Amino acid sequence: MHHFNRAKKAKNNEFFTLIDEIENEVINYQKQFANKTIFCNCNDGKNSHFFQFFQTNFNQLQLKKLIGFSFNNLSQADKFTFDGNKVTKTKLKGNGDFSSDESIEVLKQADIVVTNPPFSLFQSFIDLLIQHNKQFLVLGLNAAVSYNHIFTYFKTNKLWFGYTVNKTMSFSVNSDYQLYNPKTSNFFTKNGKCFQKIAGISWFTNLGKPHYNPFLNTNCFYKNNEKNYPKFDWYDAIYVNKIKNIPMDWNGLMGVPLTFLNCYNPKQFELVDCLANPYATLDTLKTNAFVKLNQGDVRNVNGKRRYVRVIIKKQQI
């Protein structure tokens, strides 16, 4: 399959997702986009790399329509529509926020949402898409899986990871970007442009069918190695420090690293819960009230707080 055409010009006035990152993911779903209306509702209108990518590759993807909103917190924003021939600009009544009535009205007409929503609003953004039964392909922090609703959607197969998972991505930014600091390793310049590197970025989607990994086989066992698998202090599950150490002979609950979801196969393991803060995300074992009463933390093992853990259980095959 040949490469998509590149959008040649882009004003560097937003937190830009790079064209390469968009292309490398979209190429896996090319058939899904035929005769569809695409809505980019969290970007900078026609200046967005998302809008430019789909405009440039409109015919190759056989799109029906492309719509993008700009966002202006201080005044009226704009709506941009591309039908394959020309871009039409329309002034909005509001600021272009994805949760505004104007944006939701367009969302109802769209088939697929492709964008990079604000990370701090990721859960409410996905809630909105699920509520309106929309297909989507969006960027987010890998850690968002630990959020209550996101984990539930993951568990119930309403969303899954795309083909790019837990990657350190570079985003182009303005040199006057609020957090820009050329002295830190997170920022760098190339060909006169400024970029920021952000770790743990994944694509989230409900396009097509989830592509699951082969069954995991670690060659590790709980029997005769019990000391390597202590129990959580406040949660009835064993603690597993690394994915490669998941015991193949353990049929009970176990807490594994969040990155386990990168190699998750629902035919082999069941997602039970997530320990991402002092309390269990879904409170599957109904332990949260007791933990709160005693000022505990479900992540603790031998009194020491551990990192986020996904609670899983082997499927009975």
UniProtKB/Swiss-Prot annotation:
It catalyses: a 2'-deoxyadenosine in DNA + S-adenosyl-L-methionine = an N(6)-methyl-2'-deoxyadenosine in DNA + S-adenosyl-L-homocysteine + H(+). GO terms for molecular function: DNA binding; site-specific DNA-methyltransferase (adenine-specific) activity. One of its GO terms (biological process) is methylation. It holds the Pfam family EcoRI_methylase. The keyword Transport does not apply. Keywords: DNA-binding, Methyltransferase, S-adenosyl-L-methionine, Transferase. Its EC number is 2.1.1.72. Belongs to the N(4)/N(6)-methyltransferase family. This is Type II methyltransferase M.MgeORF184P. It comes from Mycoplasma genitalium (strain ATCC 33530 / DSM 19775 / NCTC 10195 / G37).
